[in-house]
Amino acid sequence: MNFTIILAGLAIILFFIYFFYTGTTRSSYLLFVVMFLPLMDLGVTPAAFGGLSVFDAISFVTAFLCYKDILHVSRKNNAYLYLFLLFVTFIFLGSLSSEFVSKSLFNILNIIPPFIFIRLLLKELEANDYFLKKFLLYLKIACFVAIGFIVVQMVVGLNFTFYSSLNQNVTDGGKNRYPGFFGDSQMSGVFLAMMSFLFLLNLENPKRPAIKNYIFFGIAMLAIILAGSRSALLGFGAGLIMLVIFVGGNFRVTAMVFGVLIGAVLLYFSDSFVLFQRFSTLDDSIDFRASIWEGAYDIFKKNFAFGIGINNYQDYAKLHSQDQFLLVDNDEILFLDAPENGYLKFLTEFGFFGFVTLFLLILSPVINVFYQFIMGKKVSLAFYFIAPIVCWFLSFTSLYTLSDSRIIIPLCSCIAFIIAYPLNLLVKHEE
């Protein structure tokens, strides 16, 4: 039996034990998700039945047992609920109009667990003033586990993994790009880049992180480089620049000095890191992606309103866009399941209306925080949660990351945290 199947089954069993032992509460579900984050993307159903992960399965179980928390929505969050229902409606219409109706309808199940997670996290933040610190602690521990995996892989090799085979991108020019507990080094890089900003977070004084915050941040930065992901590093840089601009205070000066010192050291040893060597091939990578993007955009134009149906890109490419492929080992043709760009993936599969609705859901809370900042309110803490979203947003241009629950979970967590700001749940930490 496949090792990942055993791990997935074990994770489900552990969830039921923990969940019922602690009283079937929403906090039990939320803490289990982050405590066992490395296992959350392991599959529990085949692709033909939605390809559900451990995260999906335990989210549906929790929604059934905690249905009152799901159904009761405060008026302040009604707009997000209506946007989500509108998004699901557009995806449903796209599935019905696609060439792969049954597959698309099953895959709609994949978009519901993130909503369940955010909904329950918002409820818990509202009810429990101490939950934020505990939840953030477990997220940071998950990041340390990812870093620990990389350290072990540096010592014993890439065979230290959950997976029977890894993505071919884990080696480049004979050098390793370390995937941690992911099967793909680029996914690992984006995860580490997003999570690194949480190490800078000092709830007691957002504008003055402690020395330990900078040390942990530096360790995470080194792990990003070992993962060898250009998109992750660029997203990391964008998030850091945003923090320097908007957080201000002593953080601005300290972060700039810290960044210059770390950058100088890394550049001095750049020949030792595969990431920096990969920038020399950036032009070739862009040329390849541009040809893929052009084909994907043509697919979008032909299916403008509702798209080709969720998770249908690979099947559609096989029939109608046969230039969307890679040559892998032994010159085997592998049709792409995403066009090397997350935004084009969503445009082609969700269509214009689904795409716009989804990004309204993601960006509305972010825009609201910037509005509060302009109005003179104290929202420094919120920018530490926006930075991972900015990081993800930029990396999404060259890497479709939302196929992995371990990226979805921190992204949804940050969205929930900044939605909480209008509810005045976290603003007290600014005072």
What does each model-found stretch correspond to?
Residues 1-6, 43-54, 101-109, 182-190, ...:
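Helix-loop-helix junctions and helix-breaking kinks within/between transmembrane helices
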Residues 203, 208-213, 237-241, 245, ...:
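Hydrophobic transmembrane alpha-helices and their immediate junctions
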